[in-house]
Amino acid sequence: MDYEFLRDITGVVKVRMSMGHEVVGHWFNEEVKENLALLDEVEQAAHALKGSERSWQRAGHEYTLWMDGEEVMVRANQLEFAGDEMEEGMNYYDEESLSLCGVEDFLQVVAAYRNFVQQK
């Protein structure tokens, strides 16, 4: 999972992720927006879940972050519809709407993001 952090002309941090993980970048850009307290909450949840069967989720305005002890899923909230609403043969998976990654990989991105934000 490759990533890049940039600052736009106004100094706002933007995250770009590799193909297949774009939604993780959107989550940082739309939900985190340099809110380090949210990252603290996510890290605490990840540590609490380690080795357990439990899961945790944080719904945001545009994206929901879900995780268990091994995996993180970020999905666009617009994907919340019942299966019978989908046309037969249609798959709602879209690289721009859903992404999965391991907890350890995700926490590495969180730590790198935090370091980048604090370099102002």
Curated annotation (Swiss-Prot):
Q: What is this protein called?
A: UPF0231 protein YacL
Taxonomic lineage of the native organism: Bacteria, Pseudomonadati, Pseudomonadota, Gammaproteobacteria, Enterobacterales
Give the matching Pfam families.
Answer: UPF0231
- State the HAMAP family in the record: UPF0231 (MF_01053)
Leader sequence range is none
Supply the gene name: yacL
Q: Which family does it belong to?
A: Belongs to the UPF0231 family.
